[in-house]
Amino acid sequence: MTLALTAEKIERNRFTGLKVENSTFHHCDFSGADLTGTEFIGCQFYDRENQKGCNFSRAILKDAIFKNCDLSMADFRNASALGIEIRGCRAQGADFRGTSFMNMITTRTWFCSAYITNTNLSYANFSKAVLEKCELWENRWMGTQVLGATFSGSDLSGGEFSSFDWRAANVTHCDLTNSELGDLDVRGVDLQGVKLDSYQVSLIMERLGVAIIG
């Protein structure tokens, strides 16, 4: 299915479970739409000329797949996104505040599920997002807003973390190997259980004025 839509309000069940390829959605309103199991491949959701993205607020994105799509400036606020896959996408400036990636089993028990990989998340907003034990590798995190976010136990390996505020988020027990760690200062960040590779450790030690021999 290939489409070119502009400024359309998407009906709740229009794309549920469908596969949509190489389509263009400019200024489209997916708010409240049920996109459970929907696959978007090679689709454009960003209008470069007007620098505006699409609205996915309050959408149901359970097990939805976005592959090689442009999701720049998309509004995902308060969407239900358990099991979402965003792979090989552009998502600069996307807003994930209030997006739920979790399944609440009881008030004290939950698990998260999300696969956001090889994606440009520069200047995206993940404030207060809970993405624990998720696949978040090989992403670009330049200037990403993460105040109050928790990534505990997630795979953040191979990432680019320039202009990233490490003190703002919980990265305990994360895999950070093969990542460019930018301005990470170990004196102000809880790194309990974090995985680092030997090259990263040597750079961190150098910053602290410690010389590693051998």
Curated annotation (Swiss-Prot):
Family: Belongs to the pentapeptide repeat protein family.
Disulfides per UniProt: none
Name assigned to this protein: Quinolone resistance pentapeptide repeat protein QnrB96
UniProt cross-references to SUPFAM superfamilies, sorted A to Z: Pentapeptide repeat-like
Entry keywords, A to Z: Antibiotic resistance, Repeat
PANTHER family associated with the record: BTB_POZ DOMAIN-CONTAINING PROTEIN KCTD9 (PTHR14136:SF17)
Superkingdom in the source lineage: Bacteria
Residue intervals of the Pentapeptide repeat domain: 23-103, 116-189
Any one Gene Ontology BP term: response to antibiotic
InterPro entries to which the protein is assigned, alphabetical: 5peptide_repeat, Pentapeptide-BTB/POZ_domain
NCBIfam families: penta_rpt_Qnr, penta_rpt_QnrB
Functional description taken from the UniProt entry: Confers reduced sensitivity to the fluoroquinolone antibiotic ciprofloxacin (five-fold increase in minimum inhibitory concentration) when expressed in E.coli.
